[in-house]
Amino acid sequence: MKRDLLSGGEFKRILLVEDDAELAAMLKEFLEAYCYRVSTVANGVDALKAVMERAYELIICDVMMPKMAGDAFYYAVQRVKPELCERFIVITAHGDTQRMQEFFGHVSGMVLMKPFHLEDLLQTILLLFRELEDSRRRLTLPDEASAVLPFPTVTGIPPGLQT
């Protein structure tokens, strides 16, 4: 029931980038209960390797991490797999700095401030997937489009083409 209701009947693959091992384990367990497949890494360097090796439907990324911070990781992903940037949820407790405010202005996905309730994370994920699906639908014409935008009917041969 949870699977059909919350993940659209699919197992979506999520990359969770979080250096706090306890928080990462808790988030992984929570998301897997809703039928998401979650891979975890503790820093941006390992996250970039993971992105290059496997396809993910979503990235959830902390900002303050060792080796490569979340903002540097986001910009690296933007260079190598830009389509992933709209499927990014940035999580942070440090959103009040000038640097972070500038970074948030560049994020194509969403930002979630720590501390947050697990349900808020789930709702953010669902909202992001819903917005992506809506934008995909807008890019394709529905079957009814031919009724709304009919092609002209040719009823005769134009004079210049008559033999």
Language-model region placement:
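Two-component/phosphorelay signaling modules centered on CheY-like receiver
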Residues: A21-S39
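Non-catalytic signal-transmission and effector/linker regions of two-component phosphorelay proteins
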Residues: M1-R13, E119-T163
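Active-site T/S-Asp motif of two-component receiver
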Residues: C61-D62
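Acidic, metal-coordinating helix/loop segments flanking the phosphotransfer/catalytic sites
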Residues: T40-L58
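Conserved acidic carboxylate
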Residues: E18
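Receiver (REC) domain active-site loop signature in two-component systems and cognate sites
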Residues: M65
